Amino acid sequence: MMLFFSSLSDWFPGVSVFRYITFRTVAAMLTSGLIVFLFGPSIIASLKLRQGKGQPIRADGPQTHFKKAGTPTMGGLMILTGIVVSAFLWCNLSNIYFWVSLFVMLSFGMIGFYDDYLKVTKQTEKGFSGKARLSLEFLIAIIAAFVLLQVGSSGLALPFVKDYFINLSWFFLPFSAFVIVGTGNAVNLTDGLDGLAIVPVMVAALSFALIAYLSGNINFADYLQIHYVSGTGELAVLLGAVVGAGLGFLWFNAPPAAIFMGDTGSLALGGLLGIVAVATKHEIVLALIGGLFVLEGFSVVIQVGYFKLKKKRVFLMAPIHHHFEKKGWTESQVVIRFWIISIVLALVGLSTLKLR
């Protein structure tokens, strides 16, 4: 649709606004949000009917979680539908970065969907084999990184440093795959409480929409002395759709949640954030902006690793949001405080664009 309206600009001057990334980003945000908001109730009703008992609740989890039994999962289907429809309406479909990002998002979403499907149908906490799932994720990430390498550089930009890049050479592929897969699974681990994951995802998406826009604009990139990557500005439109869909989803995911995002949504959105960070050369900044996801992910790694070594636990329960629940925080306290942390970390991450 964007290209159609742009072609009319010679006859209708006002239509030229469709060429602007900023306008299309806002339009994509509104479109995806409206789609999720309008179609959400029917999707939730359909999923609830098909899933019966809904997502299994962890037996060792906080007692307050047992009242969530019967809540349907796979809410990521709502989010992805809103994003994809909006993106096809407002994005430049000839942009390679758009297609690579869409490939990662939908591929990770399919893996998450299969995982959710197994959990719901078998009523077990264990879904897709961990090794098989990670293998597929790394394969997808390597393919995406290889495509990016063909159209860009293998350089790694450092925050707070002007015009200095580390040439990763062949190591770019495994490094990029680690960023993409790591982000996808970190977001997945964060999604454990009503509304907990979607707001930090929106905060990170909005932050990277700005980064993508600046990195893809040669004038802004030169002024800020950040790596210029031609074409990445289009990712701002895609991320705008993510923010809008996230807002629409939050309407239904706010406590008490009518639906859970599930692996379908968390893996897809995390993978998307990872590939955007790689494309814009802001992988390290992602660790700052998405610091909450890093914290959640490392809490699990530390818990599992320490238990294998010492047969003891560092946290009362992992991921770390459950630790604070066990300490006596209410679910709302954990969620809102973690939201605050994600916003503060995003501001710190964005400050690296200027502090050089």
UniProtKB/Swiss-Prot annotation:
Which major enzyme category is it?
transferase
Q: Where is the signal peptide?
A: none
Enumerate the subcellular locations listed in this protein's record, separating them with semicolons: Cell inner membrane
Keywords, in A-Z order = Cell cycle, Cell division, Cell inner membrane, Cell membrane, Cell shape, Cell wall biogenesis/degradation, Magnesium, Membrane, Metal-binding, Peptidoglycan synthesis, Transferase, Transmembrane, Transmembrane helix
A GO biological process held by the record: peptidoglycan biosynthetic process
A Gene Ontology cellular component where this protein is annotated is:
plasma membrane
Query: What pairs make up the disulfide bonds?
Result: none
Under the heading CDD domains, the entry gives: GT_MraY
What membrane topology does the UniProt entry give? Multi-pass membrane protein
Which parts pass through the membrane?
Answer: 25-45, 70-90, 93-113, 138-158, 164-184, 195-215, 235-255, 258-278, 284-304, 333-353
Q: Which GO terms describe its molecular function?
A: metal ion binding; phospho-N-acetylmuramoyl-pentapeptide-transferase activity; UDP-N-acetylmuramoyl-L-alanyl-D-glutamyl-meso-2,6-diaminopimelyl-D-alanyl-D-alanine:undecaprenyl-phosphate transferase activity
Needed cofactors: Mg(2+)
Question: Source organism's superkingdom?
Answer: Bacteria
The EC code for this enzyme is 2.7.8.13
The keyword Chaperone appears for this protein: no
- What PROSITE patterns does the database record attribute to this sequence? MRAY_1, MRAY_2
Function, as annotated: Catalyzes the initial step of the lipid cycle reactions in the biosynthesis of the cell wall peptidoglycan: transfers peptidoglycan precursor phospho-MurNAc-pentapeptide from UDP-MurNAc-pentapeptide onto the lipid carrier undecaprenyl phosphate, yielding undecaprenyl-pyrophosphoryl-MurNAc-pentapeptide, known as lipid I.
Q: Which PANTHER family match?
A: PHOSPHO-N-ACETYLMURAMOYL-PENTAPEPTIDE-TRANSFERASE (PTHR22926), PHOSPHO-N-ACETYLMURAMOYL-PENTAPEPTIDE-TRANSFERASE HOMOLOG (PTHR22926:SF5)
Give the matching HAMAP family: MraY
Identify this protein by name.
Phospho-N-acetylmuramoyl-pentapeptide-transferase
Q: Which organism is it from?
A: Bartonella quintana (strain Toulouse)
Q: What is the lineage of its organism?
A: Bacteria, Pseudomonadati, Pseudomonadota, Alphaproteobacteria, Hyphomicrobiales
